[in-house]
Each structure stands twice: as structure tokens, then as C-alpha cells.
Amino acid sequence: MANTKSAIKRIRRIATQTLVNKARKSKYRNAIKKMNLLLVEKKKDEALKFLPKLNSELMKVAKTGIIKKANASRNISRITKKISAL
């Protein structure tokens, strides 16, 4: 258990930040799942419309450190390649 006042405050802050990070991670994973579903159903027009939103979501989580920037770039690259192959 934390002994100092500042350590107790940090525990509260970490708990809050953990919830925020989980929500952001969940949001980006759901966006990836939605895009993969569009690709499986071969809905190229909808996938192209959704691509900027997905890019934005991936870069947001990469910027905040939830995932690494290389991971986000790799995901965007692979999805873009799949869309162009449709």
C-alpha cells in the first residue's frame, strides 16, 4: 500500500488512465474488425470511405503510446494493400 500522499494520488490517476487506455484500445480494435469485415464482404466503396477514419484512429492510439507507431503504420499499409487488391 502506498505510504505517501502523492503515491496515493498516483494510484488514483493510474486507475483512471488505465480505463481511458482500455477504451481507446478497444475502439481501435473494433475499427480494425469493422474494416476486415468490409474487406471480407468485398465492399470496396465502403472500405475506402472508412479508411481515413481508421487511419485517424490508429494514429491517435500510436501517438498516445497505446500501440507503437510502426505497428499502426504496418496495419494501415496492409489494409491499404488489401483494399487496392479488391
Swiss-Prot record:
Belongs to the bacterial ribosomal protein bS20 family. Keywords: Ribonucleoprotein, Ribosomal protein, RNA-binding, rRNA-binding. Transmembrane segments: none annotated. This is Small ribosomal subunit protein bS20. It comes from the Bacteria. GO terms for cellular component: small ribosomal subunit. SUPFAM superfamilies: Ribosomal protein S20 (SSF46992). Binds directly to 16S ribosomal RNA. InterPro entries: Ribosomal_bS20 (IPR002583), Ribosomal_bS20_sf (IPR036510). One of its GO terms (molecular function) is structural constituent of ribosome. The lineage of its organism: Bacteria, Pseudomonadati, Pseudomonadota, Alphaproteobacteria, Candidatus Pelagibacterales. One of its GO terms (biological process) is translation.
